[in-house]
Design a protein with these regions (language model features):
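Generic detection of intrinsically disordered/low-complexity segments and helix-coil linkers/edges
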Residues: 1, 6-8, 35, 46, ...
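Short aromatic-glycine-(Arg/Gly/Cys) micro-motifs in beta-strand/loop hairpins
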Residues: 1-21
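Intrinsically disordered, low-complexity boundary segments flanking structured domains
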Residues: 11-12, 37-39, 58
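Beta-strand-rich interaction surfaces with strong enrichment in secreted/lumenal proteins
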Residues: 23-25
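A short, charged, amphipathic alpha-helix used as a generic interaction element across diverse proteins
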Residues: 27-48
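Short, mixed-charge low-complexity intrinsically disordered segments
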Residues: 41-80
């Protein structure tokens, strides 16, 4: 199986004084991931969100590095 690129939007919330990631949302394109991340932050009131892409080869269980497309609000240092 060849490598595939996944586009994700990931919300963040303040939990016990720290920032915690929520459930990622899979998107169809980079633009859709950015739009969804912005919506999670602005409309749904999360502390922040990030749109990112990542390559993966599920057959061998290999996941590539995350590539941040856009940040909104407060996110963990992992995405900065």
């Amino acid at each position: 199986m060849a490598e595939i690129i996944s586009f994700m939007a990931l919300p963040f919330d303040f939990v016990d004084g720290a920032i915690a990631a929520g459930e990622p949302v899979k998107c169809q394109s980079p633009a859709a991931a950015v739009e969804r991340a912005q919506t999670l932050w602005k409309v749904f009131g999360h502390a922040g969100s990030v749109a990112f892409s990542r390559t993966s080869d599920l057959e061998i269980g290999k996941f590539g590095e995350k590539h941040v497309l856009r940040l909104f609000g407060h996110v963990t240092d992992e995405y900065r």
